[in-house]
Amino acid sequence: MARKTPIERYRNIGISAHIDAGKTTTTERILFYTGVNHKIGEVHDGAATMDWMEQEQERGITITSAATTCFWKGMDLSLPEHRINIIDTPGHVDFTIEVERSMRVLDGACMVYCAVGGVQPQSETVWRQANKYKVPRLAFVNKMDRTGANFFKTTSQMEGRLGQPVPVVFPIGAEENFRGVIDLLKMKAIIWDEASQGMKFEYQDPAELLSDAEKWRSAMVEAAAEANEELMNRYLESGELSEEEIKAWLEKRVLNAEQILAYALRTAFKNKGVQAMLAVIDFLPSPVDIPPCNGTDDNEHDTVRRASDDEKFSALAFKLMTDPYVGQLTFIRVYSGILQSGDTVYNPIKGKKERIGRFVQMHANQRDEIKEVRAGDIAPAIGLREITTGETLCDPESIITLEKMVFPEPVISQAVEPKTKADQEKMGIALQRVAQEDPSFRVKTDEESGQTIISGMGELHLEILVDRMKREFGVEANVGKPQVAYRETIRKTVDDVDGKQAKHSGGRGHYGHVVIAMYRLDRESKPKGYDCMNDIKGGVSPGEYIPPVDNGIHEQLNSGVLAGYPVVDVKVTLHFGSYHEVDSSEQAFKMAASIGFKEGCRKANPVILEPMMAVEVETPEDYAGNVMGDLSSRRGMVQGMDEIVTGGKVIRAEVPLSEMFGYSTTLRSMSQGRATYSMEFKHYAEAPRNVAERSSARVQGK
């Protein structure tokens, strides 16, 4: 079957922003203007197509990333048809995993900013995630019709926090006087017709704003010229570049992520300017414009795959979702080749082959069956049972392993138990399914209490997951109070720590002996787990016993010596050992390593780590002093205070997570409901002695 749309006319984009900046509203308008939807769905009515989960419709927020496809020929229908695959992502920090895995597979992103709120905390988080995966992006300023909207203040915040913005449009008016934009490429004013819900528009000469528009156009042309020395010389000589040159070189700078933003603005809810957002065709890359994807072959040699149907098949599974009608959907991004329904693929991580049942094309939670997927496609596959998020699928005859995705560690935990015996088995199935879909969610059984412990990225994250168990699996559950995900580590280096397992009780003995050294690993923002090195010289311990040593330490990492919390940031070097020809075994060396690691932790001045959160509070100025005082009383360190576009203050602080439970109620009371806050995990830090002792006592039941 021939490709319907050339890959050069594909755009795989995500729409991301801070919560309530207008991502989903923007996506709904795009679907309307491209003819996918014949009616605009509103978030506040619970009718948005992309917010299809019941919890999303009730709460008016996006919880899970939703994918859809539309086709676009330009505002004036002058372009060949382009295919745009869109992923609408959540804005709440508790669901940051959805943004993370979407960024991994996208070719470009549209960042939506509120013209009133400016660059808000989650906007910066998403920007860093896009930087991590080198995703080219455009910025769009939304809500220009709102009281307090300030286009220039927002761009100033972008410049201070994100990079140098380069406008490609200029606003005509603001707040209730916002009428349209001036296209700085064509130097034409675009005025949208509200009666047709923005479907119709007209070009006008921007006479009244000509001087301001020319100033911004000069800045845009200069930004394009900076991409190339020859181009800059020509610009300096003539003072002008052609429209095609400007577009081409701006696109190149966006593609190279040179901290340049080509952005439009609009008011999505009032249907003004959303069509201009489809400037993604002009400025964001197709799959063939980005570098080939990197990986390793079955000999662990570096290899690449170009975005071409002629290459061997390769894809990345970036999301799992359970559908009540067809079972597990595995969302894949195809980087190269063609795959048809019924074909067999190879998973190099698991070392297993699997057969594809069929493919579907998603529109939020609606499905249309398709026969095949090609390079550049994003689509769910049905029938895969062994795969997990972040793993590679490839041609069994041409193996490649793509770079895996790294997921954040949970920072909050709760005990959960079924209300009735009938719910017991169903709860186990539900938790297993949810954990399979969401890599930032963990579930374990506490060995001492027998309780089931669920862990996630925040209170809302766990609340939504428990609600899902009830709605989707019919499981009624009681939930305990939130608990902080503490960690343990060591402060100093210890050498020559003995670990010995020696039992003789008649018959074959049980002997293993290791000598290890332990070091503290440097930590940046996230705990790094541990490194293990074998530094044994000579034949004092056979090589077959090294993996059991590693396994023994791995198991002991789950339970530290202070309070039983997981141990992180530790490097272990094995530099001596002894064995017995008859009595030694893998199990004995595993036990010896566990004993040695435990003893090493005790000697290495162990300490408890607690998660620190980056907190931003938006408050009227009258309450700013009280807010800062309250944050300080919670062991918080106030790190700065900025003015909000509409007045008031944004207070930035770093606060231990353990001090933030119930903060929303306190803040609401303190500010008469006028202040809001957001919070995200920042890093782990050593807990003060009194906090560590209190935490240890609680775990030990004192």
UniProtKB/Swiss-Prot annotation:
Domain tr-type G, chain residue ranges per copy: 8-196
Keywords: Cytoplasm, Elongation factor, GTP-binding, Nucleotide-binding, Protein biosynthesis
SUPFAM superfamilies: EF-G C-terminal domain-like, P-loop containing nucleoside triphosphate hydrolases, Ribosomal protein S5 domain 2-like, Translation proteins
Protein's UniProt keywords contain Cytoplasm: yes
Any single GO CC term annotated in Swiss-Prot or TrEMBL for this entry: cytoplasm
Gene Ontology biological process terms, A to Z: ribosome disassembly
GO MF annotations, alphabetized: GTP binding; GTPase activity; guanosine tetraphosphate binding; translation elongation factor activity
Localization of this protein: Cytoplasm
Disulfide bond entries: none
Pfam families per UniProt: EFG_C, EFG_III, EFG_IV, GTP_EFTU, GTP_EFTU_D2
Binding site for GTP: 17-24, 88-92, 142-145
InterPro entries listed in its UniProt record: EFG_II (IPR041095), EFG_III (IPR009022), EFG_III/V (IPR035647), EFG_IV (IPR047872), EFG_V (IPR035649), EFG_V-like (IPR000640), EFTu-like_2 (IPR004161), G_TR_CS (IPR031157)
Transmembrane regions: none
Family membership: Belongs to the TRAFAC class translation factor GTPase superfamily. Classic translation factor GTPase family. EF-G/EF-2 subfamily.
UniProt function note: Catalyzes the GTP-dependent ribosomal translocation step during translation elongation. During this step, the ribosome changes from the pre-translocational (PRE) to the post-translocational (POST) state as the newly formed A-site-bound peptidyl-tRNA and P-site-bound deacylated tRNA move to the P and E sites, respectively. Catalyzes the coordinated movement of the two tRNA molecules, the mRNA and conformational changes in the ribosome.
Protein's UniProt name: Elongation factor G
Biological source species: Thiomonas delicata
